[in-house]
Amino acid sequence: MSEFVERLKEYIKENNLSVTALAKKIGVTRETASHIVNEAHMPSTQAFIALVEYFNCSADYLLGRIDIPQSDSFDSVKPIGEILRKCLKDNDKKETDLQNDLNISSSLTYKWLHDKSTPTIINYIKLADYFDCSIDYLLGREQ
């Protein structure tokens, strides 16, 4: 079982939620919630954000990237564009570096930088590793 699913199940148990109740809390169908809990697939970015906001937990902790749950309060999620531009600038990188180094298409990075779409959870992980930052930082939840 993945670290993500183990931790998600812990939060579900701590909050006495059924899969149906979880689905309602995060705005997905019962079937989708069941697939997430049973590792059939990762949640969409929107559903993942709903999970971390509902449980008020660190995205990095829920994904198993850090071992200590943070109990801080988090800011609301912000669009990726401004944050990604700051990461590129702070790391002296260009958009083309990001595309080449992570094998990500120019159309995708354009959409992220202009807030036309959000990265998948897998791409958030790649970006966090690339910029050596937390996923919570990329989500705008921490400064």
Language-model features, listed with the residues they occupy:
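Recognition helix of helix-turn-helix/homeodomain-like DNA-binding domains
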Residues: 27-42, 103-119, 141
